[in-house]
Amino acid sequence: MRLCLLGFIACLLTPALVLAESTPRLTPAQLRELERQARILYEQTQEFLRQQEKSGKKVRKARRVEPKPTSCNLPSPKRAAQFSQELLPGIPLADRYALYVGACGLGDVVKLTQQLVRFQTVNGEEPPAKNPAVVAMGRFLQQWAKTRGFGFRVAGRKDVFELSWGEGPPFLGLVFHGDVAPVAAEEWKYKPFEPTVVNGRLYGRGVMDDKGPLATALISLSMAQEMGLAPQRGKVLVIIGNDEESSWLGMQEYARTEQLPTHIISVDSGYPVVVAQSGVVALNLEAMLGTVDSAGAAMLLPVDASAGESLNQIPAAASLSLAPFAGKSIDQGLAAAKAAVEATRKERSGLKAEVKVVSAPGSGSRIVISTQGKAAQASSPEEGRNALWDLAAIADKLPLADNGLTAMLQMVTRRFDGDHQGERLGFTEKDPFMGSMTAALTLLRVKNGKATLAINMRRPRSSEGNEDFHQALDHAIALINQESDGRVVEGPGRFVSDPHVTDLKSPLVATLIDIYQRHRSIRGELEPISIRGNTYARLFPRGVDFGPGIQELGPYTGHKADEFISLDHLGLNTQMLAEAIHTLALSSNAP
């Protein structure tokens, strides 16, 4: 029986067959089969040696070398050298690069993801360029790029980070965002900005959306460079926006003013490849709290309310502050509030609500009703539980004074509660490929005597143009205004974007589908998909999304409490993106 004398990696690839220099690229399945056969052969060899020794026969040990496991802890040049042509004769460079990423990439990706997650890049009212966490992350990325010989610059509105590799015009752009969704800390078991690995999962805000994917790209490029690969058709860019969870102004500026790559891949959605995104609609409703002329049967006056943390996220928490009204005592109001909560609990399964009395300096005591829901992206409202719906349902059972905030909550119950698709507003848009419309309430605030409610909608393509859609919005607003006796009106900030649809049959799409299909061992034909989500890819004419979500490996957890990605999932994402980068930019046969 032949003994393996070539070291561990060579042992896995060469004992079962002799590979010629002309060997074509191996598929992931072929690589796995070679590894399986080699492991069996190695185990048989060891058993043969043990039996020989037991029988007392002499075993010739001259020049016998024990296989050594790959060491991923070596300095980069020595680590990459384990996958050299000398140690793996006959294996094409593309496959040796894939083996290198498969063996050592995951550890590097986890480490870099953890470093990125520690920057608490939640955007507030200040622009990203003035957010200390965003600025600090930019400095970190600049140093990371410098030590590896990559270019780095700041673009957009001084809030887009661009890492570059190679010469010539940009050919491949990998697009990510470095800002993350807000965190409701009380909902988390693990600390959101102290990433940790537990039971094969990496936890932390941004590990799925979108710092984990960013790390897969950076490590894939770094390891390609270590293997002696280089861009063949032009520059490879890693483009990192930092306002994806808010305004998009920085990346819009970048897409409008910069020379754009031939191929654009965002990694902020799912597989096999996303070629279409619903249009985004932002709408604001307002109501002045005003004064109340007569009390009637009212016992409580709404004075403040709050729901949500982000314009594109379903509220996980909501609260309503009430003052005793028309001579009623705090105890009477408290009893009424508790009764309303209990009555609502009987009607709404899983309701999480509490009532408490708090002290309001200068204003006496206040009764506060709080509800807890489940956060989800506004593009997938059905995956969450809107805490504002629950709060409005409770308010509907309270003897409230009739002011603007009361009117706003009544409107929520009448036109939104239980309806994710905007049907109660009169919308019926559906598309066979892109699906149905959605309408989600995301942010409620009271400031300077005025209640403001943000609505986030997603619309599929249709035969009707933007003008027709604006008319439908006008009709919905008129209905709301009429039902509230003129108290709820549209505020400033209406925004309507077109759906984004790129070429479903482009070489880029075909390449990415082929990569996904081979790595997932999927038989049959795969088709590109559409999402209601909203990624930076829509800003680029040929932009598509490739990952990171794989439903079979776990739910998409971006924007949710205890956001996580399994290590198996993260490793697979890294291997697929690495192959995409090689095929599209590092090979002379790039499409």
Where are these regions (language model features)?
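Positively charged n-region of N-terminal signal peptides that target proteins for export
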Residues: M1-C4
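Boundary at the C-terminal end of the N-terminal hydrophobic targeting segment
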Residues: V18-A20
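N-terminal helical capping/dimerization or prosegment-like subdomains
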Residues: R25-A184, T452-I455, N466, H569
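Active-site metal-coordination/substrate-binding segment of hydrolases
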Residues: F171-I240, S246, E258-Q259, K560-A561, ...
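Acidic/histidine-rich catalytic neighborhood of metal-dependent amide-processing enzymes
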Residues: D210-V292, D331, A335-K338, D419-T438
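A short core secondary-structure module
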Residues: L285, A295-A297, A316-A318, F325, ...
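An extended, acidic, His-containing surface patch that forms the Zn2+-binding/catalytic region
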Residues: V368, Q372-A454, R458-H475, I480-P591
